[in-house]
Amino acid sequence: MKSIQSNIKKAKKYLDNNHCVAVPTETVYGLAANAYSNSAVKKIFSLKKRPLNNPLIVHYYDIQRLKEDCDINDNLVKLYKKFSPGPITYVLKLKNNSKISKFVTNNKKSIAVRFPKHKLFRNLLKNLDYPVAAPSANISSRLSSVKPSDVKEEFGSKIKYILNGGKSKIGVESTILNLLEKPSLLRYGGLDTKKIENVLKKKLLINTNSKKKLSPGLFPLHYSPGIPLRVNVKKPKKDEAYLLIKKRKSKLKNYYYLSKMKNIDEAAKNLYSTLRKIKNDGFKKIA
C-alpha cells in the first residue's frame, strides 16, 4: 500500500510541474498532462508527434469535478450513472469560463471527457487539483500501448515517469459519443453500443466519419502496426504473419492467435499486443 501511494505521489509531482506521465487505464495506457496548462498539453503533442488539430480526451475523477468545465445534460447523467467510470467518452459543451487549455480542444467550444475505471489512475485523479488530458501513450498513428513495456518501446526515456498498473484489461480505446445534440457515435470502442442504446432507449446516429473532428480517433490513419495487411486470407504466404481470432493446431511459427476460444473480448484485449509482437518478431506483412 505504501509503495502504491509513493508511486502516485511521484506521478503527481511530475504532473504538478507540467511534465507528462504515462498512466494505466482499463482501455489502454495514456500519456497524461495537466489539462489546464498550455505548456503541459503542448508537450503531449510534441512527444506523440500528434497534429494540433487532433483534440484530446480529458479525464476526470467524477461528474462533480466535471461541472467546473462542462454543461451537464440529461443524456450524460443517464449514461454516467450506468457506465462511468468505464470505457466511454462523452463530447460535451465547454463552459466559457473553463480553464481547459485551448490546445486540448483545438479552440473548439466542445470537449471530449471520460471517467476512467482503473483504480490506480482514479486514485491519482482524486489527489489532483485539475483534470488530465491523456491520449493513448504511443507515437501518433502507431499501435496503442497496453502495458508499461509498450510505453518504453514507444518513448524510451522521453517520458518522466510511467505509473505501472499492469496490463490494460480491455485493451482497446473507449467508445466515443457526441452528446452535443442527438446522441451519435463518433468512435467504436470498449463499450458495446447496444448497451448504450438500451439506456438511452433510442438508436444512436452513426457519425464515425465526421469531418468536424470533435474527438480523437477520427483521422484516416490510426492505431496502425505500420505493416501491410491482407484480409480474409485462408492460407498465408511464407513471409506473412498469420493473424487468427481462434487458436488452431499448428507448429508453424508465423501463426498468431487473439483468442483460445474465439472470444471477442479476449481478442480485443490481445489485438494491440499481438500486432506489436508480430512487428517485433520481424514480419513485414500480415494476413
Descriptions of predicted regions:
Residues 1-287:
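Active-site-adjacent structural elements in enzyme catalytic cores
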